[in-house]
Amino acid sequence: MKPSFKDEKALWEYIRPRLRGRMWSRVETICPDGMFDAHAFFGQSQIWLELKVGKPSIKALRPSQHSFLIELVRHDQPAWTCFGCRGEVLFFEGLDFDTAVVPPFYRPSIARS
C-alpha cells in the first residue's frame, strides 16, 4: 500500500527512518551574497533537504528557499528537494527538477522489526 502524505510532517515521518548519514537541515535560511560563513552553512557538515508535498516543481519553493538553494549549489553543497506525490517519494538534486534520483543517503525500503 502506498503511503499518504497529507503534509510535510507526514512526509518527514515516512522518510526519516530511511535516511542515513549526516546532520539534516531544511532549506529555510537566506545567506546574503558576501556574508561570511558564520554558521557553517557551506562546511560540508550537513545535507540540505527541503520537503514538499504535491507535484514536483521548482515553483513549490518559496522565493527565500529558491535563493538559498541557488547559494548552496553555487558553493557546491549537497542540497536536495524531496516531494511526496501520489504515494511516492521523489528526490531532486540541486536545481534539477526534471529528473528524480535516489540519493546515496536514502534507503527506500527499511527492514521491518
Predicted segments with their positions:
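Nucleic-acid nuclease catalytic cores
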Residues: 73-99
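Active-site-adjacent loop/helix micro-motif of nuclease/hydrolase catalytic cores
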Residues: 55-66
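Conserved catalytic cores of phosphodiester-cleaving nucleases, focusing on short active-site segments
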Residues: 38-40, 44-55
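Acidic-basic catalytic patches of nuclease active cores, encompassing PD-(D/E)XK
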Residues: 1-29
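Helix-rich interaction surfaces within compact, conserved domain-sized segments
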Residues: 96-113
